[in-house]
Amino acid sequence: MTTRACVGLEDNEWQSAVNSRILPLFLLFSFFLSIFEAVIKNIQSTETMNRLRYFLVALAMAVAALLPVNTWAQFNWPYTIQNGTIITQVPERPAGQQSALGLTVEKIPVVRVAFVGLGMRGPDAVERWTHIPGIEVKALCDHERDRAEACQNILRKASMPAADVYYGENGYKDLCKRTDIDLVYIATDWLHHYLVAHEALEHGHHVAIEVPSAMNMTEIWSLINLSESKRLHVMMLENCCYDFFELNSLYMAQRGLLGEVIYVQGAYRHELSPYWDEYWKNGADDQLGWRLDYNSKFRGDVYPTHGLGPIAQVLNLHRGDRMRTLVAMDTRSFNGQELFKARTGEYCSDFKNGDHTTTLISTEKGKVIEIHHNVMTPQPYNRMYQLTGTKGFVNKYPVEGFALAKDVMAKAGVNVSKDYTGHSYLSKEDTEVLLKSFTSPMVLRYGEEAKEVGGHGGMDFIMDSRLVYCLQNGLPLDIDVYDLAEWCCLAELGSLSMNNGNKPVQVPDFTRGEWSRFRGYRHAWAKPEDEAATRAAAMEFTKQLKAKGAKYWKKASKDAD
C-alpha cells in the first residue's frame, strides 16, 4: 500500500509552479520581509510602523496576483502574533474607493442572466428562474458541453428562447466578455467560484455566487475591493437565510420577542457519503472529486455559511455589531482518511480537514457565536440554528420550537395559555397563535409560490426572487460583499487558530471602520406603487418573451424534422 501526504497541489504541479514563478516571487517577498524585520526594531513612530505594515500587505497582494491560478486557493494571507493573538493584515482602502455598504445601482427592469456551473445545483437554478417575471437567460456555461446543452430543455419547457452555450476550461471567460449580461450566476465547484466572479466583475457584471463564495482571505479582500471599486453587487447565494423558520425567527428577534440575543449556534452537520461520488471529477485520473480533494488539503470550517449566515443576520453583523475574536478546534481526521484510502488505494498521512470542527466567535457587543462543521460521521442532518435571548429561546434542530416569556408575548398582543420560559417549547396551538402575528413579510410574500416551485423546500426560490426583486427595484441586496467576507473567513482564520495551538484570531473589520454605520439588519422593500409598476412591466416582458420562445421552439422542431 502506498502512503501519500496530502498537499495543496500535486507534486508535479508544485514543481512546475516553484520552478517557473513561485520561487522567485517568494525570494523577493522574503527579501522585503527581512528588511522590514530589521528596520522595525529601530522604529519608534506608530505611524511609520503602520505604513510599513501596509506596504507589506500590498506587496503580498501583488505577489498573490502574479501566482498561478491554482495557488489562489491557498491559505497564505500575512499575519502577526501580538500578545498571544493572531492578527491578519487589513489592507487600506485605495484612494477614491468607497464602501459598498447599502450599495444601490440603477434599476434593472429586465435582469439578463448568465449561468456558469450546471452540474448539481446549476440546472435547478435555471429552472427556478423561469418562474420569475422580468428575467432573460442569455447564456449557459459549464466545463462539460452536454451539461450546458441539457439546460436548453428547461428553457424550452418554459417557452423561453434558447440561450447561447459556452463550455470548456475557459468558456466562462468568453461569456464574461459579453455586454448584454447584467448578472452572472455562479454554481461551479468551490475553486472556480472566485475565478468566475473575478472575471465577471472585471467585465462589469453583478455576480451571485454559490457557497462558499470565497475560499480564503486573498479572495475575500479581492472581492471586497472589486465590489467597492466597480460599484457592483456581489451576493453570496446563502439559501438557508431564506428558510421559513429562519425568516420567521429573524422577524421575531427584530420585533423584540427574544429580548437581547446573546448566544447563537449554527452548523453544517451533514454526512455526505451518498454524495461524494456525485461531485465533478476532472478526468479519469481524478479519483476523489473536487470536494473530497479540497477537504483532504485544507483545515478549518470550509463550509460555514449555512450555519453562520442566518444567525449573523440576527446579530446585525456589520450593522451595529461585528465579529471580534475567533478560536477554532478540531478532531483529527478519522473517516476522512478512510474515504481517501477507499477511493485511491493510498493512505493519506496528512488529511487536513478534521472530522469535526468547532469555531467560537465573540462580538464587539459581547455576544457569542458557536459554529460546527462535520460532513464525515453518521448523524441526522443538522444546521442547529439556536438563538438564546434575554427574553426567549429559538431552536430548529433536532426539535423545532419557541420558548418565549409570557409577558413579552402579551405586550406584543399574543395571548398564550402559559409561561413556557426555561421549561418547554410552546405547544402547537400556541405556536400557531404566535405565527399569526409574527410570520415574516418575506414568507407572506413568497411562501406559497416557493412551496410550489421548490428548491430545498422553497427557500432557494425565495432567495432568487429576492435577488431579482432588489435588482429590478434598485435596492440594496439582502446579502452584501461584507456578509460574504464575514461568513467565509472562518476557513482560513480557523486554520490559523488551530495551526498555532488554538490561539485566538482577531477577525478583521472587513468594512474598514464602518461596521456601525447602519443600525440593525433589514430587508429592503420598494414603495408599493413603484413595486406594482415594476412587476407589471416584468410580467408584460415575460409574456412577450414566452410568445417569442414558443415560436422559436416550434421552428426548431420543424427544422429538426
Map each language-model feature to its residues:
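Short, positively charged and aromatic/hydrophobic N-terminal segments
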Residues: 18, 22, 35-41, 45
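Bacterial N-terminal signal peptides that target proteins for export
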Residues: 47-58
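Bacterial N-terminal signal peptides
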Residues: 57-67
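Boundary at the C-terminal end of the N-terminal hydrophobic targeting segment
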Residues: 71-73
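N-terminal Rossmann-like dinucleotide-binding module
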Residues: 75-158
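C-terminal helical cap and adjacent loop that interface with cofactors, partners, or active-site loops
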Residues: 75-87, 91-95, 124, 312, ...
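Beta-strand-loop-alpha-helix segment that lines the small-molecule cofactor/substrate pocket
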Residues: 183, 189-190, 194-242, 256
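Predominantly a Rossmann-like dinucleotide-binding segment in NAD(P)-dependent oxidoreductases
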Residues: 230-233, 240-351
